[in-house]
Amino acid sequence: MVQGGGLLGRCLQSVELPAGWLVQCGGGWEGWSPRDWEPRLQGWKVHVSATPECAVETLARTTRVCVEFGVSFKFLPTLAGLTEASSKNQARGAAGKFITIYPDDDGQLGELLSVLAGVLRGQEGPYILSDLRYVPDAPVFVRYGAFLGMQMPDVDDELVESIVDPRDMRLVPDHRDPRVVIPDGVEVPEFLRPAYEASQQSCVSRLDDFVSIKPLSFSNAGGVYRAELPDGEVRILREARPHAGLDGRNRCALQRQLVEEEVLRDLVGVKGVQQLRGVFTAWEHRYLEVDYIPGVTLASWRVQNIHLQESDPVEYARQAVAIVDQLIVIVEAIHRRGWAFGDLHPGNVLVSDDGTVTMLDLEDASRVDSPREPGVRVFQYCADKSADAVQADWFAVARCIMMLYFADFEIEAVSPAFWDRCRHRVREVYGERAAEQLISVEGRYGVGVRPVTASDVTVGVPSRRLSVDSGIAGLLSGIEWSRQFGPDGAFPGYITQMAAGVHEVITTGRAGVVLAQQRIGVVPADGDVDALRKTAKQWPGQEAPGLLNGLAGVALTLSEVDAQRDDAQRDAVAAAGRALESAVGRRRLDLAAGQAGVILAALEVAKTVGDSGLMDRAVAAYRR
């Protein structure tokens, strides 16, 4: 196999495709199957996980077994795909799956598992939370689920993956939760009984010492919990899953936690840093036990005090300056101990009710004299590569300060002069102390340092305030400019642009632009109106009928086109009627995408166009 495309794009498959086998690619996966393979609808399927370090070898060994058995399988073909599958923000119910194998029957499943357990013994990979682990010393997992894509609408009319209930042949959701779920009516084969029983067992650990444990947040790296001891003392438990929760440097949660433990031990006694109280392992997950600090994040503090910021900017600035004073002192103390914080942003700064500041989450810290390698970051607070680790911390502190006063500072990524404008406004609105504090921090990193999100294409800041008219003109010009990046002459509005008509609807497409133009007195382009008419006529019956995400919104937009466009208004009536018909079969009742929005759109179209028939149908739908 050719291996190229850079490190992340490197092909992980080192085995040649056998004669008589087919390859299919889609959704980030590469599938290999015998030419005569006849897939089942559902059954027990095998998942294999891997770390980036052993992925090539794990895939090669698994491929040889699958070819020997003549069994179909799919895999993530690149290191980038594998890293994403095990990343910190990946859905926990699906994370970690590197290879999926589709046995022909349970007999083959048992033989396959036995062989894989042997050839993959000692290989490493994250635990797949949705699955049974076949043996403890190999990354081989099993889950009952769909082999072929079958979908059914959920309570919000969103299509979800499904399987057939073997008891009554009805479609039921194919649950992919971060826990083992055996569908009703499915028997666990005898050779999977030990794995199933092991999944139901608990182990004695430090966790048993706490009278209550409440989750505060979850990620694929592990959870963060509030835990109370019998004497009433409260701790925070930070969980780390081995080989899971990869960051931009391919470090797993456990590797980052080991760094954080080292940092916290070095920072014992530093005021303003969350203190370490212990470390323990429960089952295969490792926990840091740290002090519980009541309070809110710096970002939340800012939101909670917006009323004060608007009503009394002087008092707001006094409190903000006091918070920043503490933040500066804490960062200086961390640097004196030889560490750079790393992932410094408002979410990792805690403010207590009395204004005391505490810094949290040092898993991305590094030695001040080591090369800077960003791992997990909130990018608008992250300096570009020109900054060293210490300078990057001060760059982030400056952005934390500016966030307290002007949260839209992030525009600096495309307009460097906007930062200067914000600094000037800090002095003008919040006083000398706030401005000098910011300027002092800015002096601690290089003049040319920019955010990592900075664009090569930059725009200036208007020398005077925009009028409403000039602002609207600028927006319209920018919207028109963006058309070059949209499909079929539409406007880019949704990152995937996958669903039918998504680039034509109100929320994410052309209808939203045309509707806004009409309501401010700008005549939309004939080409856009004609495109919406075409969309209305060709809208697939199975697609969303909703006001903001579907056909009803297109109809509403067409109804407001200049009355001289009778063709558009006729199409609006027809589209609103079809949206009503489609909505009857939907479960959702909300305004955005449900029956309420469709009915209101139909009423508005009927009123605007003067169509009594549509009005009667809309009223009848409302009464239902």
Regions found by a protein language model. Name each.
Residues 1-7, 155-214:
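Juxta-kinase regulatory segment immediately upstream of eukaryotic protein kinase catalytic domains
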Residues 11-30, 190-230:
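ATP-binding glycine-rich phosphate-binding loop
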Residues 41-52, 214, 220-260:
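ATP-binding glycine-rich loop module of kinase domains
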Residues 262-272:
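Structural motif at the C-terminus of the N-lobe alphaC helix and the adjacent alphaC-beta4 loop
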Residues 275-286:
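Short beta-strand micro-motifs within the conserved protein kinase catalytic domain, predominantly
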Residues 284-297:
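Conserved short submotifs of the Hanks-type protein kinase catalytic core
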Residues 335-346, 351:
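Catalytic-loop of the protein kinase fold
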Residues 364-432:
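C-lobe/activation-segment region of protein kinase-like
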